[in-house]
């Protein structure tokens, strides 16, 4: 499932890949405001948001990104060597773009590439598919919640709109909710 590289999707990929966060609507709106007001657009903003990681080596940042996308030994049939190879690939991309100050843009490009081309990859395909589901959920979360949350966090509150406008919370399997039966 390829994800269209809209600004919002690119921001979601970046936030999840580098920061391990899914953005609430307030933070997403602030980021989109920054994008609108930066002459370099979304890439300029993402390069600026890379600043907290500037004191780290490219390999350290790559290890964070690789872990955040779910490439971990023992998951999805991945080995420690698969993880090391992924870290080396991301490290090489960061090193190639570091002299130009484009590490933020590079992270976004790596995330987009992983999202759109790795689902059929024999080694990383299962991780890419799981990542894409999480990104779709993160984009949906952004539109429905004002608060930021750790990427992969399960939302346990859902707003049900009906005659009573009820809010119910709980965990999987313990919620019984009225169904909407109105015809469309």
PLM regions and their residue ranges:
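Substrate/cofactor-recognition hotspot
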Residues: 1-184
